[in-house]
């Protein structure tokens, strides 16, 4: 139970569990004289398969929406779908490589809203590319001081239709703690430097 700030109105919430101790349903009163109900159906491996939200209010029609989740054989998320008013749309599609790393993500079933991911031999993320955003991460390569511990030595990015490449070079202390982030533009991160630089003064 919770009391609405500045009033005597109270909101009550009830939780229902399945035989495995998972929250199967929550029922909460709302300030519109109705209830908000969330019901979850799980997979055999305890991942949510469907999550249904039902909203009622006094004198208003009931609204129900449902999220549906699909997984592959390794329990990695493949698809998220949303249903409202009987209309189902795809929110996201996911694809993985043979090592189980996220390879691509498409939003709303559109190829124009697709992001692809690249990795190095150590499975460290090295790039994200799409029509709206591109980012590259460098460890022992690039324009910063080479790092072999997993620290990012530099990164660059470009958003939307911008022609300007922006980036940061990073430096660390002897304990691999971030000390400086030096801003720059162009692929070499050496133009308009220090416009948005940050420095860690102490640990």
What are these regions (language model features)?
Residues 1-203:
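Acidic/glycine-rich beta-solenoid
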């Amino acid at each position: 139970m919770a009391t609405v700030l500045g009033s005597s109105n109270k909101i009550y919430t009830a939780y229902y569990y399945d035989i495995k101790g998972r929250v199967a349903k929550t029922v909460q009163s709302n300030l519109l004289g109705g209830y908000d109900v969330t019901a979850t159906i799980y997979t055999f491996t305890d991942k949510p398969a469907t999550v249904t939200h039902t909203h009622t209010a006094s004198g208003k029609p009931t609204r129900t929406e449902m999220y549906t989740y699909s997984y592959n054989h390794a329990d990695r998320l493949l698809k998220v779908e949303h249903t409202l008013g009987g209309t189902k749309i795809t929110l996201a599609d996911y694809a993985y490589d043979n090592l189980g790393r996220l390879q691509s993500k498409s939003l709303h079933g559109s190829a124009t809203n697709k992001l692809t991911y690249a990795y190095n031999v150590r499975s460290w993320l090295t790039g994200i590319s799409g029509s709206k955003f591109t980012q590259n991460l460098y460890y022992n390569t690039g324009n910063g001081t080479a790092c072999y511990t997993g620290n990012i030595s530099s990164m660059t990015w470009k958003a939307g239709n911008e022609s300007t490449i922006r980036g940061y070079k990073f430096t660390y202390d002897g304990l691999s703690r971030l000390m400086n982030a030096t801003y720059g533009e162009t692929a070499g991160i050496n133009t308009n430097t220090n416009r948005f630089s940050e420095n860690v003064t102490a640990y």
